[in-house]
């Protein structure tokens, strides 16, 4: 390790992507398995640092990324950190992301929804924010509920083959199957 960036000029979007992936796919499984430890401390600090760098102004407030994979990773991380720690910052960040992707924009208006790894994270992340809202913020839940339901219903309508397996990607507006390959991470979406 050189303790240097791979590029001469660091790219904040790339750094945020790497941090979100590391937090969700690297640190979260460890802290969920062993509980409080240096791994949890690392995840908490990494998440705080990501939100300190939030550079995208949205109607919901500043968020670290407009990319649905990154936002989905961060939704899952902040939701679980909130349940684990009770720290209101994580709850606020999760709701800020969910507000942006459920209330101020809609995945149903996009040209593509990925239903496999590197795209479907937003679906699970939004569902985790919905669980949190249903428990802690009933008014927010009432606004989220029809939108998450419409998203999940549309995925079932256009995103599955006759056997109920998910395609890799679909256009939610037109119903066009963009990638007929079958998602090997279907459980992520069906867990939502």
Give a label for each model feature.
Residues 1-192:
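Glycan-recognition and catalytic cores of secretory/periplasmic carbohydrate-active enzymes
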């Amino acid at each position: 390790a050189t303790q240097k960036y791979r590029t001469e000029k660091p790219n904040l979007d790339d750094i945020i992507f790497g941090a979100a992936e590391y937090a969700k796919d690297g640190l979260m499984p460890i802290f969920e398995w062993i509980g409080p430890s240096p791994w949890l401390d690392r995840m908490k600090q990494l998440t705080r640092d990501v939100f300190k760098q939030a550079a995208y102004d949205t109607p919901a407030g500043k968020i670290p990324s407009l990319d649905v994979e990154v936002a989905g990773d961060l939704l899952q991380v902040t939701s679980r950190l909130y349940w684990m720690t009770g720290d209101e910052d994580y709850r606020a960040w999760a709701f800020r992301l969910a507000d942006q992707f459920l209330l101020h924009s809609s995945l149903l208006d996009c040209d593509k929804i990925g239903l496999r790894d590197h795209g479907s994270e937003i679906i699970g992340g939004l569902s985790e924010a919905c669980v949190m809202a249903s428990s802690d913020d009933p008014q927010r839940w009432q606004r989220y509920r029809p939108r998450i339901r419409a998203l999940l219903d549309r995925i079932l309508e256009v995103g599955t083959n006759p056997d109920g397996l998910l395609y890799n990607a679909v256009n939610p507006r037109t119903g066009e199957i963009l990638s007929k390959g079958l998602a090997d991470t279907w459980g992520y979406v069906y867990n939502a």
